[in-house]
Amino acid sequence: MNVIDELEREQIETCKHTVPEFAPGDTVLVQVWVREGGRERVQPFEGVVIAKRKRGLNSSFTLRKTSHGEGVERVFQTYSPQIESIKVKRRGDVRQAKLYHLRELSGKAARIKEKIN
């Protein structure tokens, strides 16, 4: 095995939070450590996963939410130490891997059907 792959796997195992299985279309709540001035606090960010990038230690995912009528997107590194926890709120039933078309939609048109097990 490659030395770099071994080092990346060790870094992933030392990650302080567990990463649940989630896919594009799922609504996810991410608790992120934020530094404001001299103090740190945990800030929640809840949104729909519109993209997921699987690259081992360099994996990331993009969340989109609407805040006060304005669309907000944020990219998170999956194994970042800034992330306190990741929770899946609901599963979405979509057919695409990237949901960039949601950027042009708003209101009821941007709804995602819930996956029924």
Swiss-Prot record:
Q: What GO molecular function annotation could you give as one example from this UniProt entry?
A: structural constituent of ribosome
Record's Gene Ontology CC terms? cytosolic large ribosomal subunit
Q: Which UniProt keywords apply?
A: Ribonucleoprotein, Ribosomal protein
User: Keyword Membrane on this protein?
Assistant: no
GO BP term (any one)? translation
Q: What does this protein do?
A: This protein is located at the 30S-50S ribosomal subunit interface and may play a role in the structure and function of the aminoacyl-tRNA binding site.
Q: Which family does it belong to?
A: Belongs to the bacterial ribosomal protein bL19 family.
* Name the record gives this protein: Large ribosomal subunit protein bL19
According to its UniProt entry, this protein's organism is Halorhodospira halophila (strain DSM 244 / SL1)
This chain is encoded by the gene named: rplS
